[in-house]
């Protein structure tokens, strides 16, 4: 499994934004990352200043890199329906909120909680609890 470092993740987002603004072609995951960045105009200024934000620690505030990385993970899960049933659960969220970004953020809450619990418990993520969370938010 590919596990990029904090620096690699940040450089990917900075590079994606730089290429987009320069009109350069994007490759691979950069295309998906750009879609996420475009959903978050509040991050554009930060992404345009890598020298200022590259090494910043986010302790008491929302970490934009973590947020966008969770978006990437969720988009990948949806594209392959893994865990099985996530795509159907997301469609229910989409129907409920009638807004793609709002539905994604509802799902991100469940993903973040699942990751947090797995790290806390030093265990694998609980797919059943993850899907249950999505279903609860969709109802």
Regions found by a protein language model. Give the residues of each.
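Amphipathic, non-membrane alpha-helical segments in soluble helical-bundle scaffolds
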Residues: 3, 60, 64, 100-101
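Amphipathic alpha-helical protein-interaction segments
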Residues: 111-112, 116-119
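Aromatic-anchored, charged helix-turn/loop surface patch used as a conserved interaction hotspot
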Residues: 29-94
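Glycine-rich, aromatic-bearing surface loops/beta-hairpins
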Residues: 120, 124-139
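Residue-level recognition of alpha-helical structural elements
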Residues: 86, 100, 123-127
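N-terminal leader/targeting peptides and immediately adjacent processing regions
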Residues: 1-39, 44
């Amino acid at each position: 499994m590919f596990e990029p470092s904090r620096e690699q993740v940040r450089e990917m987002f900075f590079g994606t934004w730089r290429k987009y603004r320069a009109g350069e072609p994007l490759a691979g995951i950069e295309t998906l990352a750009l879609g996420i960045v475009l959903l978050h105009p509040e991050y554009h200024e930060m992404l345009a200043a890598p020298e200022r934000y590259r090494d910043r620690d986010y302790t008491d505030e929302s970490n934009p890199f973590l947020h966008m990385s969770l978006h990437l993970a969720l988009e990948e899960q949806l594209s392959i329906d893994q865990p099985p049933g996530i795509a159907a659960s997301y469609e229910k969220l989409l129907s409920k909120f009638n807004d793609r970004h709002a539905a994604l953020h509802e799902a991100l809450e469940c993903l973040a909680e699942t990751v947090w619990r797995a790290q806390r418990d030093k265990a694998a993520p609980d797919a059943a609890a993850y899907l249950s969370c999505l279903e609860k938010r969709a109802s």
